[in-house]
Amino acid sequence: MDVIIENRKVRFNYFIIQEFDAGIVLIGSEVKSLRQRKVSIAEAYVTEKNMELWLCNLHISEYNHASTKNHNPTRPRKLLLRKKQIYKISGNIKNDGFTVVPLSLYFNEKGLAKAKIVIVKGKKLHDKRETIKTRDWNREKSRVLRGN
């Protein structure tokens, strides 16, 4: 599994409820830009339209060597999932407080582009502070244990 990009802020800003692996419908110039790692998922999110899931605000830069028919960098891209998974995710999208965002993009063993999408719930400020405290405490523990 060749990870292209990972959105590490998701783990800090949200509680992760459930993870899914989804295929992405892309065109050729988008795949070539992905292989060059010219992509940003910081503002990306998943929406549901007509019982299909779409990845919005995923910015894949235009491929420099493509012909005049290059892709739109922020166009919505269809996600490929099983029907059961689509029902589960779309039900959570409709619930208040839940969001679906991409955690990472990667190429699988067959060379296909995949997105790891997660159902998340937003953290409050005190939860974020608690995360920082536990991370610092774990770092300090490992330093002390290495020192002995």
Curated annotation (Swiss-Prot):
It is found in: Cytoplasm. Transmembrane segments: none annotated. InterPro entries: SmpB, SsrA-bd_prot, SsrA-bd_prot_CS. One of its GO terms (molecular function) is RNA binding. Gene3D superfamilies: 2.40.280.10. One of its GO terms (biological process) is trans-translation. Belongs to the SmpB family. This is SsrA-binding protein. It comes from Ehrlichia canis (strain Jake). The lineage of its organism: Bacteria, Pseudomonadati, Pseudomonadota, Alphaproteobacteria, Rickettsiales.
